[in-house]
């Protein structure tokens, strides 16, 4: 079987240039250090491929296996791992320094929905003009905001003044 690898991560069959290789059989047994030509013959007899698993080792470690099946299983594992990853979005809720209580309630309900959905929430109080002199009001607003949703979220990054915004990041509570 003459397969030349399309997958550039592995060196297969005739692409192996070293004189001697350490060979692992298709059943996982150690066959020892043998010449590459002999290892290729062993692989051909079993109608399998000789794949360099760690080409940088001295001598390189090669395994006799079905390369097509191996690549298929690798891609299948990668897809499975990708499927299991959870992408966490950061949603932003903007408040002003002079926000009314009812508006805070509405914004906190939106943030609650985001946290329940598993997203992080960035809460920003925006200061205009001289309002930055009264940053303590922004901290009060953020504390009040957090009190309304502390049953579904935790503070990941506490309130901090960054430029003209006071920002706090909330994360969903672990169940």
UniProtKB/Swiss-Prot annotation:
GO molecular function: ribosome binding; translation initiation factor activity
Signal peptide bounds: none
One GO CC term on file: cytosol
Pfam short name (any one): IF3_N
Compartments it resides in: Cytoplasm
Annotated InterPro entries: T_IF-3_C_sf (IPR036788), T_IF-3_N_sf (IPR036787), Translation_initiation_fac3_CS (IPR019813), Translation_initiation_fac_3 (IPR001288), Translation_initiation_fac_3_C (IPR019815), Translation_initiation_fac_3_N (IPR019814)
Any one Gene Ontology BP term: ribosome disassembly
Alphabetic keyword roster: Cytoplasm, Initiation factor, Protein biosynthesis
PANTHER family: TRANSLATION INITIATION FACTOR IF-3 (PTHR10938), TRANSLATION INITIATION FACTOR IF-3, MITOCHONDRIAL (PTHR10938:SF0)
Protein family per UniProt: Belongs to the IF-3 family.
Subunit structure: Monomer.
Protein purpose: IF-3 binds to the 30S ribosomal subunit and shifts the equilibrium between 70S ribosomes and their 50S and 30S subunits in favor of the free subunits, thus enhancing the availability of 30S subunits on which protein synthesis initiation begins.
Name assigned to this protein: Translation initiation factor IF-3
Source organism (scientific name): Clostridium acetobutylicum (strain ATCC 824 / DSM 792 / JCM 1419 / IAM 19013 / LMG 5710 / NBRC 13948 / NRRL B-527 / VKM B-1787 / 2291 / W)
